Amino acid sequence: MDPVSVVHSFARSQGLPLNFETVGCEGPSHDPRFVIECKFLDFQHQCTDSSKKRAIQKICVLISNDLKENGLLEEAKTFKPEYKSIAQVYGKFFKRYIAEKESSVITPFKLVNNQILLHDIDELVEYGSSEYMFRHMLLCYIIHKQGIDIKEMCNMKFSPDYIECLSHHLTSTVDIDVHQQDCGNLSVVIFAKDNNIKKQLQIQVSA
């Protein structure tokens, strides 16, 4: 397949949004050159051409190369439609939660390997709320990122594909940096890709 088809096919198989944005226009009005930008997963590229279509083609070549270099094309899989639907809805409310949160630091959260979301001690979180979606999606990302083994709970278990699907979708929605601290905590910095909102969370990891 050509690079454009490769990138679009990969995005569809992973349930990830793929958007090309015109961020500028250079040159005289009679001969403009369009500046097109695309942020996809952890990749960000910008190309300029007199044709928007050709600029997008150039970006797809770069993204296709990124996917190959990172071994993602070989590992690409098709997630269940229900997983992708959940990821899309949760991702939307994840970004909304960040935008509405006044504090830039949220602490502490605990990561317990038989729970379904990050939580505070003795804290009740309403199922289906934006708070729940935020914590659950972030938990799936951390589980996938850190390679944490999850135990079964109340006759329920996490599907590895489900966790991977939500994790991949989240990285297409926001930028996340995770650092292991000497004390055992995870320092998580979340940056929304479409604005200047930045949040830092200190998360206590416990088995």
Curated annotation (Swiss-Prot):
Q: Which domain of life is it from?
A: Viruses
Q: Which GO terms describe its molecular function?
A: RNA binding
Provide the DRBM domain boundaries: 2-69
> What keywords were assigned to this record?
RNA-binding
Q: Which residues cross the membrane?
A: none
Which protein is depicted?
A: Non-structural protein 5
Spell out the PROSITE patterns in the cross-references: DS_RBD
NCBIfam families to which the protein is assigned, alphabetical:
seadorna_dsRNA
